[in-house]
Amino acid sequence: MRSVADRVKRIGLSETYAILDKVKKMKAEGHVVYDLGGGEPDFSTPEHIINFTVSAMKNGMTHYTASKGSPGLLKAIANRLFEENHISACWDKNIIVTPSAKHALFITLMTLLNPGDEIVIPSPCWVSYIAMAEMAGAKAVDLPLTRENKYQITRKALAACITDKTRVLLLNNPNNPTGHILTEEEIQVICQVALEHDLFVVMDEIYEHIRYITAPHRSIAAEPGMFERTITVSGFSKAWAMTGWRLGYLCAPEYVLNEILKVQQHSVGCAGAFIQQGGLAALIGDRQPMEDMVKAYRKRRDYMVDSLNRIPGIECYVPEGGLYVYADIRGLGMGDAQTFTLWLLAHAHVAVTPGTAFGKEETMMIRLSFAGAMETIVAAMDSIAEAITEYDASLQQEAS
């Protein structure tokens, strides 16, 4: 039989979905499993968004929109980008609404990258970045970030990744999995290097509203000279608990956006018409539900970090944004992240994600999500601590 395309064969399945499949199997067998693997908010989509969307459907908003999106939502996005991100974007020239921020990233990379190009991606990074780059035929170049350096990008490290084949720099701010938020110094380094080497910058800002520090969010596209080379991607899934709606958007200079639009038109066509109305309701409606969710996430983050840091052998970087804690397990002496993750699922019935899902060098790190309910987090932390205590006790018995 004929084989499938090489570009698909050379990428692997998502490790986060693989863990989710294991969790579903255990639950189907009757086990109680505490799932800290995915970034799925436990909150329901705010009522005013649902009501607005249902009304739109009943009033005939069930047909195609323009491929860029509906004018109302495009204008609302442009207003938000200007007021909150200080990005001056024309609603009809610089924005495309997409069925998820993930799709926005995909069509952007398909547009920017040629086979053989290089794209620099800070590591650790979200699982799909590298797969997307490889599907475009490009080579993903790791920019290693370390916990010891607070996951900050330095000019020396970034410059060392640049070659004559480098075309794109892809960044996530706040970062998944570390929760790091770019500092002023890092922003200036990124801008300087991008301008010096004539690079495109793709900014994934899906977690921009989920922040736990007082400093306001900074968008690279708002920096001097950067709008014409920056593609900003965001969406509604995380901040508004709209993961199942699949709605995102991108903002790009017109000459780039017109090319990205071709990929949108020849793939999905447009985002769902009534789904777009849900996004409009989120942007023009009451922001209090989003702010309340962020307050709850902060409490969950604090509880999880404190609980994990109480376990001898585990150390956590306190995330400044996002929905995850990135923990160092090397002090446990219980094997690498892959081994520990499987052990944890079997003995504590807690699902977490191994660091190797976010970078091949992340062999002693695990990611835990605090997007779920506080009672789930409390039970999971107790179960982890109890399982590790029992493991240590069994080792002591064997030694004696």
Curated annotation (Swiss-Prot):
L-aspartate binds at residues 37, 126, 176, 367. One of its GO terms (molecular function) is pyridoxal phosphate binding. Catalyzes the reversible conversion of aspartate and 2-oxoglutarate to glutamate and oxaloacetate. Has very weak prephenate aminotransferase activity. It comes from Musicola paradisiaca (strain Ech703). It is found in: Cytoplasm. Keywords: Aminotransferase, Cytoplasm, Pyridoxal phosphate, Transferase. InterPro entries: Aminotransferase_I/II_large, AspAT/PAT-like, NHTrfase_class1_PyrdxlP-BS, PyrdxlP-dep_Trfase, PyrdxlP-dep_Trfase_major, PyrdxlP-dep_Trfase_small. It catalyses: L-aspartate + 2-oxoglutarate = oxaloacetate + L-glutamate. Its main location: cytoplasm. Its EC number is 2.6.1.1. One of its GO terms (cellular component) is cytoplasm. This is Aspartate aminotransferase. Homodimer. The lineage of its organism: Bacteria, Pseudomonadati, Pseudomonadota, Gammaproteobacteria, Enterobacterales. It holds the Pfam family Aminotran_1_2. GO terms for biological process: amino acid metabolic process; biosynthetic process. It is an enzyme of class 2 (transferase). Its cofactor is pyridoxal 5'-phosphate. SUPFAM superfamilies: PLP-dependent transferases. The modification N6-(pyridoxal phosphate)lysine is found at residue 238. Belongs to the class-I pyridoxal-phosphate-dependent aminotransferase family.
